[in-house]
Amino acid sequence: MIREERLLKVLRSPHVSEKASAAMEKNNTIVLKVAKDATKAEIKAAVQKLFEVEVEDVNTLLVKGKSKRHGQRVGRRSDWKKAYVTLKEGQNLDFIGGAE
């Protein structure tokens, strides 16, 4: 059993993009930014507990930070982890419905 304190730290924010919106409409999949050290089991447990939906599958990937220039200095954005969470049939979770 994963502690509730850890579950609150696993999910960072929803990742809103055209691809994420298409995945939600087509495959009933939500896209989230998660903690870099989060496991698939922790992500699944956090989504089920916090949003009260049934999760079918979790796919994760590490997004590498881009190099950016600030004048002559070259900086780098942080790496972060993205999770594609597929919900079971009949389950719905809408992050961007009220953003019209």
UniProtKB/Swiss-Prot annotation:
Transmembrane segments: none annotated. The gene is rplW. InterPro entries: Nucleotide-bd_a/b_plait_sf, Ribosomal_uL23-like, Ribosomal_uL23/eL15/eS24_sf, Ribosomal_uL23_CS. It comes from the Bacteria. GO terms for cellular component: ribonucleoprotein complex; ribosome. This is Large ribosomal subunit protein uL23. Belongs to the universal ribosomal protein uL23 family. HAMAP family: Ribosomal_uL23_B. Keywords: Ribonucleoprotein, Ribosomal protein, RNA-binding, rRNA-binding. Part of the 50S ribosomal subunit. Contacts protein L29, and trigger factor when it is bound to the ribosome. One of its GO terms (biological process) is translation. One of the early assembly proteins it binds 23S rRNA. One of the proteins that surrounds the polypeptide exit tunnel on the outside of the ribosome. Forms the main docking site for trigger factor binding to the ribosome. GO terms for molecular function: rRNA binding; structural constituent of ribosome. SUPFAM superfamilies: Ribosomal proteins S24e, L23 and L15e (SSF54189).
